[in-house]
Amino acid sequence: MASNNSRTNSRANYSNEIHDLSTVQNGTMPTMYYGEKAIADFFPPHLLKKVVSEVVATFLLVFMTCGAAGISGSDLSRISQLGQSIAGGLIVTVMIYAVGHISGAHMNPAVTLAFAVFRHFPWIQVPFYWAAQFTGAICASFVLKAVIHPVDVIGTTTPVGPHWHSLVVEVIVTFNMMFVTLAVATDTRAVGELAGLAVGSAVCITSIFAGAISGGSMNPARTLGPALASNKFDGLWIYFLGPVMGTLSGAWTYTFIRFEDTPKEGSSQKLSSFKLRRLRSQQSIAADDVDEMENIQV
């Protein structure tokens, strides 16, 4: 803690220093300094790593889930509908444990939006995450189209029956997924070690139910990629509006019921080992960001 404070104070002191007397006499400050500071503030050094992580995670998510769905659609004897749901839940679990400590493993534009709205994620990074997620999903879909040829439908999600039925289902199942996600990802009292398993199980359970009605997308990127590769856009708006409504309402609901426990002085409350590792990792990244910003300014 002392080390972090010293770095912060060092950065603050440096920003108040004036190394050229002419800047005071002329009433101006170096343009490059402000430009560099703005770039460092808005585009942190680790943003590229986060973006690449989201591309990879979303690619694998769509490749596995839509691949299983595409094969199942052509031959149910090879992969059942239950197998599709299990594959979707497992890949979400695996990716959370793989890159959750790097990018948060959003893999879903609606999830990123909800985190930003409720101040768990910086708005400035939202467009980069969206671009990464859609890029990963679209690339995975076209790779799948080439790999499982001659299957034409690459795991597309289309409504079965009236569109409003599918919309309601998408809102509810995405609500469930986001409610669980926000609980295990942001509440230190939750069992952090089971975060990936909890979210993956939520995806698996909801997709088992929703698969026969709406396809159980819960993810605009997961729908758009296969739609482009398969050239099927029936009810596409449902899979943008439904997940957004579901994630926002799910995040709002958990935020509303969340009990903010203020620890008493002298009490010892320990974080779970999983959350402690993530917290230390975030603190380390933040410290590295400060060091790199100071090096840029020097």
Curated annotation (Swiss-Prot):
GO terms for molecular function: channel activity; silicate transmembrane transporter activity. Belongs to the MIP/aquaporin (TC 1.A.8) family. NIP (TC 1.A.8.12) subfamily. It is a multi-pass membrane protein. Gene3D superfamilies: Glycerol uptake facilitator protein. The chain crosses the membrane at residues 51-71, 85-105, 124-144, 166-186, 194-214, 237-257. A motif (NPA 2) lies at residues 219-221. This is Aquaporin NIP2-1. InterPro entries: Aquaporin-like, Aquaporin_transptr, MIP, MIP_CS. Glycans are attached at N4, N13, N26. Mainly expressed in the roots. In roots, it localizes in the main and lateral roots, but not in root hairs. Within a root, it localizes on the plasma membrane of the distal side of both exodermis and endodermis, where casparian strips exist (at protein level). Expressed low levels in leaves and anthers. Aquaporins contain two tandem repeats each containing three membrane-spanning domains and a pore-forming loop with the signature motif Asn-Pro-Ala (NPA). GO terms for cellular component: Casparian strip; membrane; plasma membrane. Induction: Regulated by silicon level; the expression being decreased 4-fold by continuous silicon supply for 3 days. The lineage of its organism: Eukaryota, Viridiplantae, Streptophyta, Embryophyta, Tracheophyta. It is found in: Cell membrane. Its main location: membrane. Keywords: Cell membrane, Glycoprotein, Membrane, Repeat, Transmembrane, Transmembrane helix, Transport. The keyword Transmembrane applies. A motif (NPA 1) lies at residues 108-110. GO terms for biological process: silicic acid import across plasma membrane.
